[in-house]
């Protein structure tokens, strides 16, 4: 379990700042895939009609976790940047700090 604070003081390379400022931290989430990307258009065209599945469906998944990506937004100039972290199974934004001798809770 990785516990990350909701704010972080880090360098902002936006035009207005170019100094260390407080950034708001959120977790990156992938957007919805576009129906009009070239690969998707080609795939849909190939799939239409008779003939079943035309491309292989991938089954041999190797990884059990994804890398955590943080989205940092400057509170002064609203510039956003992304910061990749190491792999982990659980992430918590702004959770309580660990106490000595306490058990972990999920």
Curated annotation (Swiss-Prot):
GO terms for molecular function: structural constituent of ribosome. Belongs to the eukaryotic ribosomal protein eL42 family. Gene3D superfamilies: 3.10.450.80. Disulfide bonds: none annotated. It comes from the Eukaryota. Confers resistance to cycloheximide, an inhibitor of polypeptide elongation. InterPro entries: Ribosomal_eL44, Ribosomal_LSU_eL42, Ribosomal_zn-bd. The gene is RPL44. One of its GO terms (cellular component) is ribonucleoprotein complex. It comes from Candida tropicalis (Yeast). One of its GO terms (biological process) is translation. The keyword Ribonucleoprotein applies. Keywords: Antibiotic resistance, Cycloheximide resistance, Ribonucleoprotein, Ribosomal protein. This is Large ribosomal subunit protein eL42. PANTHER family: 60S RIBOSOMAL PROTEIN L36A/L44 (PTHR10369).
